[in-house]
């Protein structure tokens, strides 16, 4: 009987804690400022596809804030278990609700006119401490809405302590799944690998496991694998870029990169060719540009502010050459953080999160929309803060987390 009483008490404490959290959130939300976007130049219609994700910092609480296309503000208390869906996931859910159940990571999808494919990794650890990893695979034939789904074990799963899906492509009825794997080790050595798994959808099995890159290092040396931001992660792509960043952690705890030891690589799915991009020519694609770039599988777009002005540079991935360099009509400030989206033949450029001596200011965020080819400004605007409680307004921080475009 005592055991049941203890269980009941624990449940009541948990429910009371959750209830207290939501009461605090609800009471604080009523006094929070709201935000809209004020048009400075151009047509308001350019905002129809824009959504700005942000947060308000109120003491120890963070309130999600969404400034959507009609310039209204949506503030809501965040659930302990909620997921923030973006436009791309929302569209897939609305079009294929049954297939999308339980699937919410855009990097795990592939979509063309005929098929919607999905491949994710489920990682669990056994009692012995080894990882038990499975591919969760699904394919939807859009024509007849026929769904196929299955799970298969990751080859040599006992070697790995962590796996992450980078890219999914459907080529000749086989899924190509590119992953970054951390190898388990019993000594001081650490190993990171990039794997390409080929999954035969008809046989429901992994028919190939190719290690594209393997790097072994020992502390204080460090190695990181990175990929540029993919602005269209679910679309068919024949090429993917990734970088190997090497560095060292000094005794004082400071980290120093080793640019000469780091490199940029490209992998071509159709030719199965792995190439090191050297960037030897002036104004050609290189490691520094790719690390801060945005790619759509054909081009890489990078923001450059070294001249004291914002420039959007476009590089052709196949030739590695600079094909366009346009100046953006927005004042440059090195204390600003920038967010970029490339879509609809436009560049959407948002700057904000300005800091003064490491303190976040409440300065307005600036939004620019320009034609991707000509650089012509189509829209300029800025966020406007509407205080609900002027007495406490300056104590509330505003932080931008993402820029989304339909």
Language model segments and positions:
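Acidic, serine/threonine- and glycine-rich low-complexity intrinsically disordered segments
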Residues: 162-336
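Structural signature of eukaryotic scaffold interfaces centered on beta-propeller domains
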Residues: 45-58, 103-113, 164-175, 182, ...
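Glycine-rich, flexible loop segments associated with nucleotide phosphate handling
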Residues: 131-136, 190-195, 257-263, 361-369
């Amino acid at each position: 009987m005592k055991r049941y009483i203890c269980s009941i008490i624990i449940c009541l404490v948990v429910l009371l804690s959750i209830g207290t959290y939501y009461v605090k959130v609800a009471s604080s939300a009523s006094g929070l400022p709201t935000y809209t976007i004020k048009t400075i130049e151009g047509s308001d219609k350019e905002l129809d596809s824009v959504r700005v994700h942000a947060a308000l910092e109120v003491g120890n609480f963070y309130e999600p804030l969404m400034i959507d296309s009609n310039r209204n503000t949506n503030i809501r208390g965040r659930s302990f278990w909620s997921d923030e869906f973006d436009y791309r996931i929302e569209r897939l859910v609305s079009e294929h609700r049954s297939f999308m159940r339980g699937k919410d990571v855009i990097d795990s999808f592939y979509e063309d006119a005929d098929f919607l494919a999905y491949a994710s990794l489920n990682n669990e650890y056994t009692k012995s401490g080894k990882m038990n990893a499975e591919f969760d695979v699904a394919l939807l034939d859009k024509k007849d809405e026929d769904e196929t789904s299955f799970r298969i074990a990751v080859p040599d799963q006992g070697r790995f302590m962590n796996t992450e899906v980078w890219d999914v492509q459907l080529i000749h009825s086989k899924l190509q799944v590119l992953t970054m794997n951390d190898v388990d080790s019993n000594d001081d050595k650490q190993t990171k690998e990039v794997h390409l798994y080929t999954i035969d959808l008809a046989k429901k099995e992994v028919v190939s496991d190719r290690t594209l890159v393997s790097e072994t290092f020992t502390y204080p040396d460090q190695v990181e694998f990175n990929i540029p931001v993919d602005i269209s992660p679910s679309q068919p792509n024949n090429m993917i870029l990734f970088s190997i960043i090497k560095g060292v952690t000094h005794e004082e705890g400071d980290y120093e990169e080793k640019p000469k030891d780091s490199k940029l690589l490209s992998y071509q799915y159709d030719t199965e060719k792995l190439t090191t991009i050297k960037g030897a020519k002036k104004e050609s694609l290189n490691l520094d540009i790719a690390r801060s770039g945005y790619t759509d599988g054909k081009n890489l777009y990078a923001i450059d502010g070294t001249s004291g002005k914002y420039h959007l540079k476009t590089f052709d991935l196949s030739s590695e050459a600079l094909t366009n360099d346009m100046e953006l009509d927005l004042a440059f400030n090195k204390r600003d953080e920038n967010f970029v989206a490339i879509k609809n033949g436009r560049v959407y450029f948002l700057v904000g999160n300005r800091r003064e001596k490491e303190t976040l200011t409440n300065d307005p965020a600036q939004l620019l929309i320009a034609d991707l080819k000509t650089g012509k400004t189509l829209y300029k605007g800025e966020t406007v803060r509407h205080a609900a409680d002027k007495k406490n307004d300056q104590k509330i921080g505003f932080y931008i987390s993402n820029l989304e475009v339909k």
